[in-house]
Amino acid sequence: MFFKLLKDAFKIKQVRSKILFTIFIILVFRIGTTITVPGVNAKSLEALSGLSFLNMLSLVSGNAMKNFSVFALGVSPYITASIVVQLLQMDLLPKFVEWGKQGEVGRRKLNQATRYISLALAFVQSIGITAGFNALSSTKLVAAPNWQTYLFIGAVLTTGSMIVVWLGEQITDKGYGNGVSMIIFAGIVASIPEMVKGIYEDYFVNVPSDRLQSSIIFVACLIVAVLLIVYFTTYVQQAEYKIPIQYTKIAQGAPSSSYLPLKVNPAGVIPVIFASSITAAPAAVLQFLSASGNDWGWVRTAQSLLATTTPTGIAMYALLIILFTFFYTFVQINPEKAAENLQKSGAYIPGVRPGKGTEQFMSKLLRRLATVGSLFLGFISIIPIIAKDLFGLSDTVALGGTSLLIIIATGIEGMKQLEGYLLKRKYTGFMNTTTK
C-alpha cells in the first residue's frame, strides 16, 4: 500500500515537488548535525554516552546532541516554548487568550511569541549544557572555558536551533507532515543502523560462545516484540471513534446523516515528545550540579527520584505523558468550537441537545479518548524502560518504544496527509470533468 501510494504521488508534479522538498529539508538538517560547534571537542562526550538524560536529549534533538553539532539543541527549546504558550492561553494571560480566539491573525501572533520565547530559552539552555557537559567531561569539552567562549558557543547553538525551527516550519508549510515531528523522525531513522550495530555487538560479538544460543533466542524475541509494537501502534494510531450526526432540513445540500470521526488517540505522539523534553531538562541540571564538585545531598536524592532508571523516575515520566495527552487532546479539539461549528452547519448529534449539551458531550468523550490514548502512549514508552532494568538491556533498547512511537505516528500522519491530498485531487478532477 505504501509503495503504491508513493508511486501514485510521484506521478503528480505538485505532490512530487512537496515530497522532494521535504526530503531536501531533512537532508539539510542531517548535514547540519554532522558539523561540530567550533572550539568544542565532541569526542569527550563519548564517555558520557551511558547517561540516560543524554540519550533523551539526543532523541528530542533528532540525534544531533551526541556529537555536539550546531543543531545540538534541535527543536527542544521550541517544544518547551510551545508548551508555555499553550498554557498561557488557558485563561492565564488575557492577551494570549484573546489571540487564541482571533483565528489566523491570532495564530500568527502566538507563533511569533513562541519564537521569541524559544530564542531566549535556546540561549540559556545552550550556555547551561555547554558548561554542564564541560564539567561532566572534566573540562575536556571546551578548550578555553571562559565567558567569551561560552557566549560564542551559546550564539552558535541558539542560531542553529532557530534554523532547525525554521526548517521544521518549511516542512509544515510546503512539505508533508508536522515539521517538528519530521525533524525528530529523521534523526531517529538515521540512528537505526547504529542501533542495530549496537545490538549485534552486545548480543553476538561481545558474548562468550556458550551464551550465543541464548542471545539468538533473546534477539528473536526482541524482533517479535518490535513487530508487535509496530502492529499495535499502527492499529491504535489509525483507529477512529465515529460520532453519528444528522442534519436539519435547513442545511441545504447537506446529507441527511453522516458521522464525525475522532481519533482514538487524538493527541498523536506529541505528548511523548513533550514528556521526553521536560524529563531531560531537570535530569541534565541535576547531573551538571553533581559534577560541580559540591557534595549536595539534595542533588543526589533528586537524581535518584527523577532518573528514568528508578521506579519514581519512570512513574514521573508516565505521569507527564498522561498529563500532556489530556492537555494536548483539548488543544487539538476544542469542545466549545466543535459544538459551535456543528450548530452553524445545521448538524446535531442524535439524543444530544445542540450548543451547551453538545459541548458537554464532546468534553466527556474527549476525556475518555484521552484516557485510552494516555494509557496506550504510556504503555509503549514505559515497557522498554522497565525491560531494560529487568534484563540489563542497553539504553538504545530502552528508548526503542518511544522511538518506534515517533517513527510510526509521524509516518502515518505523512501518509494520511498524502492520501488525503490525492483523494481531494481525484475528486476535484472528477468534478471538473463532469461539469464540462
From Swiss-Prot:
<comment type="subunit">
    <text>Component of the Sec protein translocase complex. Heterotrimer consisting of SecY, SecE and SecG subunits. The heterotrimers can form oligomers, although 1 heterotrimer is thought to be able to translocate proteins. Interacts with the ribosome. Interacts with SecDF, and other proteins may be involved. Interacts with SecA.</text>
</comment>
<dbReference type="GO" id="GO:0005886">
    <property type="term" value="C:plasma membrane"/>
</dbReference>
<feature type="transmembrane region" description="Helical">
    <location>
        <begin position="151"/>
        <end position="171"/>
    </location>
</feature>
<feature type="transmembrane region" description="Helical">
    <location>
        <begin position="116"/>
        <end position="136"/>
    </location>
</feature>
<feature type="transmembrane region" description="Helical">
    <location>
        <begin position="19"/>
        <end position="39"/>
    </location>
</feature>
<feature type="transmembrane region" description="Helical">
    <location>
        <begin position="179"/>
        <end position="199"/>
    </location>
</feature>
<dbReference type="GO" id="GO:0006605">
    <property type="term" value="P:protein targeting"/>
</dbReference>
<comment type="function">
    <text>The central subunit of the protein translocation channel SecYEG. Consists of two halves formed by TMs 1-5 and 6-10. These two domains form a lateral gate at the front which open onto the bilayer between TMs 2 and 7, and are clamped together by SecE at the back. The channel is closed by both a pore ring composed of hydrophobic SecY resides and a short helix (helix 2A) on the extracellular side of the membrane which forms a plug. The plug probably moves laterally to allow the channel to open. The ring and the pore may move independently.</text>
</comment>
<comment type="similarity">
    <text>Belongs to the SecY/SEC61-alpha family.</text>
</comment>
<keyword id="KW-0472">Membrane</keyword>
<keyword id="KW-1003">Cell membrane</keyword>
<dbReference type="InterPro" id="IPR030659">
    <property type="entry name" value="SecY_CS"/>
</dbReference>
<feature type="transmembrane region" description="Helical">
    <location>
        <begin position="395"/>
        <end position="415"/>
    </location>
</feature>
<dbReference type="InterPro" id="IPR026593">
    <property type="entry name" value="SecY"/>
</dbReference>
<feature type="transmembrane region" description="Helical">
    <location>
        <begin position="216"/>
        <end position="236"/>
    </location>
</feature>
<keyword id="KW-0812">Transmembrane</keyword>
<keyword id="KW-1133">Transmembrane helix</keyword>
<protein>
    <recommendedName>
        <fullName>Protein translocase subunit SecY</fullName>
    </recommendedName>
</protein>
<feature type="transmembrane region" description="Helical">
    <location>
        <begin position="68"/>
        <end position="88"/>
    </location>
</feature>
<feature type="transmembrane region" description="Helical">
    <location>
        <begin position="269"/>
        <end position="289"/>
    </location>
</feature>
<dbReference type="GO" id="GO:0043952">
    <property type="term" value="P:protein transport by the Sec complex"/>
</dbReference>
<feature type="transmembrane region" description="Helical">
    <location>
        <begin position="372"/>
        <end position="392"/>
    </location>
</feature>
<keyword id="KW-0811">Translocation</keyword>
<feature type="transmembrane region" description="Helical">
    <location>
        <begin position="313"/>
        <end position="333"/>
    </location>
</feature>
<keyword id="KW-0813">Transport</keyword>
<dbReference type="InterPro" id="IPR002208">
    <property type="entry name" value="SecY/SEC61-alpha"/>
</dbReference>
<keyword id="KW-0653">Protein transport</keyword>
<dbReference type="GO" id="GO:0065002">
    <property type="term" value="P:intracellular protein transmembrane transport"/>
</dbReference>
<dbReference type="InterPro" id="IPR023201">
    <property type="entry name" value="SecY_dom_sf"/>
</dbReference>
<dbReference type="Pfam" id="PF00344">
    <property type="entry name" value="SecY"/>
</dbReference>
